[in-house]
């Protein structure tokens, strides 16, 4: 049996880039909670003792940007300079302007257009991917890397591993074989965790705790064997982290946000963008389409692409590839997808309820992935997707 190795990485919520994603989406939540027609393009950057929020926002909402920044940093665990940032004492800079009137008239007619008439907020192409290798219909390498990162945060916050600090990265290499186009995982080949820690803990203690409290609860035994390679804090020391260790910027973890390197990516980031930005809404609808194809037995694995022109409601193209795993020809699946899903941005926002903010709705997406999550706020993952051509064959 011929096999291959594939690797996916993740970072947890204390990584400086992910900190920025979360702040941008917390701003989006605050705007949409008060004004569902808010137009938000919010970027964040951070470095030692500083967070800056900037971009274009047109909203009726009264938003305290500085409070959102400090609350988000504090919730993550950035409560002192020692851990990488002090939420209560760092500098917060805000440079927010209104959306360009040129874009506003072209996309939503200054809010005069009906939902079906709303154009895409920009040009671009987005991809959705699904595979039957996990119950989430997501790639196993990505799922495991993501869950390891989430578990790191869990054992830090609940006190199981008090030596942990907010920043951290994970990476998982899985050995697969190709079964007529479908990807079938065999085992975990290599597992890597690099986590920020305090001065009190030894490397041996770090390795022991990570194996017992992070790896063991996350990685199913069937995927581990005597040949599995573990790299646990291989650099030997990771005390300085967060924005103190590295600069952070919104939108720099787009592969972690999606499919861990599987499928394809159009290049557009998600966080801080309202649903007229098809970088986000377009990616959500094609994930739902791809997931529906696999969930309904039309294929074991598939990718869906959609593309847009700024100001134009209808997509320029829709593409489906099932990697040879389709139960019917791809062109027939494409026809079903076009009949089952409305790819116009205004209708995506309605059908996926993307104008609803608050309750950390989009903040939750900004760490540990936008896809494969079991949460009713992740409407693009829900069972409410159109039943696209179910098959029992």
UniProtKB/Swiss-Prot annotation:
Entry binding sites for ATP: 15, 167-169, 235-238, 246, 252-253, 269, 273, 277
A biological process from GO: one-carbon metabolic process
Entry binding sites for K(+): 43
UniProtKB keywords: ATP-binding, Cobalt, Cytoplasm, Magnesium, Metal-binding, Nucleotide-binding, One-carbon metabolism, Potassium, Transferase
GO cellular component, one term: cytoplasm
Cytoplasm recorded as keyword: yes
Source species, domain of life: Eukaryota
Cross-referenced CDD domains: S-AdoMet_synt (cd18079)
Location of this chain's protein in the cell: Cytoplasm
PROSITE patterns per UniProt: ADOMET_SYNTHASE_1, ADOMET_SYNTHASE_2
Reaction equations catalysed: L-methionine + ATP + H2O = S-adenosyl-L-methionine + phosphate + diphosphate
Cofactor(s) of this protein: Mn(2+); Mg(2+); Co(2+); K(+)
Enzyme Commission no: 2.5.1.6
Cofactor: binding comment: Binds 2 divalent ions per subunit. The metal ions interact primarily with the substrate. Can utilize magnesium, manganese or cobalt (in vitro). Binds 1 potassium ion per subunit. The potassium ion interacts primarily with the substrate.
InterPro entries with a match to the protein in the record: ADOMET_SYNTHASE_CS, S-AdoMet_synt_C, S-AdoMet_synt_central, S-AdoMet_synt_N, S-AdoMet_synthetase, S-AdoMet_synthetase_sfam
Subunit structure comment from the entry: Homotetramer.
Entry similarity comment: Belongs to the AdoMet synthase family.
Cited function: Catalyzes the formation of S-adenosylmethionine from methionine and ATP. The reaction comprises two steps that are both catalyzed by the same enzyme: formation of S-adenosylmethionine (AdoMet) and triphosphate, and subsequent hydrolysis of the triphosphate.
Protein name as it appears in the record: S-adenosylmethionine synthase
Encoding gene, per UniProt annotation: SAM
């Amino acid at each position: 049996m011929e096999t291959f190795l594939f690797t996916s990485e993740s970072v947890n919520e204390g990584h400086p880039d992910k900190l920025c994603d979360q702040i941008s989406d917390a701003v989006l939540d605050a705007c949409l909670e008060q004004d569902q027609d808010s137009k938000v393009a919010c970027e964040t950057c951070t470095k030692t003792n500083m967070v800056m929020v900037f971009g274009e926002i047109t909203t009726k909402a009264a938003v305290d940007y500085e409070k959102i920044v400090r609350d988000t940093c504090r919730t993550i665990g950035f409560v002192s300079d020692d851990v990488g940032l002090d939420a209560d004492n760092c500098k917060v800079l805000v440079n927010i302007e209104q959306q360009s009137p040129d874009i506003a008239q072209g996309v939503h007619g200054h809010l005069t257009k009906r939902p079906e008439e709303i154009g895409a907020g920009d040009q671009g192409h987005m991809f959705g991917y699904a595979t039957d290798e996990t119950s989430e219909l997501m790639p196993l390498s990505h799922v495991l890397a993501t869950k390891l990162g989430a578990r790191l945060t869990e054992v830090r916050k609940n006190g199981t591993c008090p030596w942990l600090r907010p920043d951290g990265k994970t990476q998982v290499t899985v050995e697969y074989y190709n079964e007529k186009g479908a990807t079938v995982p065999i085992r975990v080949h290599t597992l890597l965790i690099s986590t920020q820690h305090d001065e009190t803990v030894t490397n041996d203690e770090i390795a022991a705790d990570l194996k017992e409290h992070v790896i063991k609860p996350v990685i199913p035994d069937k995927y581990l064997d005597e040949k599995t390679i573990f790299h646990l804090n291989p650099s030997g020391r990771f005390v300085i982290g967060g924005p103190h260790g590295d600069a952070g910027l919104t939108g720099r973890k787009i592969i972690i946000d999606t499919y861990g390197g599987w499928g394809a990516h159009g290049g557009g980031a998600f966080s801080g963008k309202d649903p007229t930005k098809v970088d986000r809404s377009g990616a959500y609808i094609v994930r739902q389409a791809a997931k529906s194809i696999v969930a309904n037995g039309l294929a074991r694995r598939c990718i869906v692409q959609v593309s847009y022109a700024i100001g134009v409601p209808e997509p320029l193209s829709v593409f489906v590839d099932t990697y040879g795993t389709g139960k019917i020809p791809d062109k027939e699946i494409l026809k079903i997808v076009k009949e089952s899903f409305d790819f116009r941005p205004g209708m995506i926002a309605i059908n996926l309820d993307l104008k609803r903010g608050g309750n950390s709705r989009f903040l939750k997406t900004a760490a540990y992935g936008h896809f494969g999550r079991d949460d009713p706020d992740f409407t693009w993952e829900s069972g409410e997707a159109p039943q696209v051509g179910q098959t029992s064959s």
